[in-house]
Amino acid sequence: NADVIVLALYPEDIKEALSKLKFSLQKRIKSNYEQKLTILCGTNKNHMMSKLENFLLDDLKIEKEWYCSNVALRDMIIRRSSNSDAKDAVQLTTKIVQTLLIQSPVYFDVSKFKWFELNNNLEMMKDIKLFTYNSPHAACAYVGYKYGYQTIEEASKNKDIKTIMEACVLEAKKGILSSFEITAEELDDFVEKANETLNK
């Protein structure tokens, strides 16, 4: 009877999870046909939803009419910051630093959740995130390692490394504006939030 199912998994594990849900979905079709269901996939890999939808309908043989009328299979972007005491530590500290971006539309009331935010262009935003969040983060990790820092948090406080990170974002913005349908103002807002994340 769930309204929402969240699959916070590695990309390669999502099909297996959907396979395990098959029995429950078939039971729901028989006993609770009209109730709406949202399935959220929390992974950094992009452009997966259509393949997963085809997997549900073609491979798992979930009834198409029921699925199209009652199920929203959606992607999301988890914007978080993780730290550890050492690079080989198995215990991580993770905190949410911005709202969870969810591909719209969905079948539940997002307004009831403080940290949830719907987004109409999630695939594009996920691609952009790769350049505005991940590229300076990766540069910081690489250069920080060369400088002898143990953590990204320490490295990001170095003036020279911070300059390199900012240069990565500036270079990325040029390519993004020429490749994606996003305004400079929208991109600046997205990048500003990215910088807030990296500085936390």
Language-model region placement:
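Substrate/ligand-engaging "lid" and interaction regions
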Residues: N1-K200
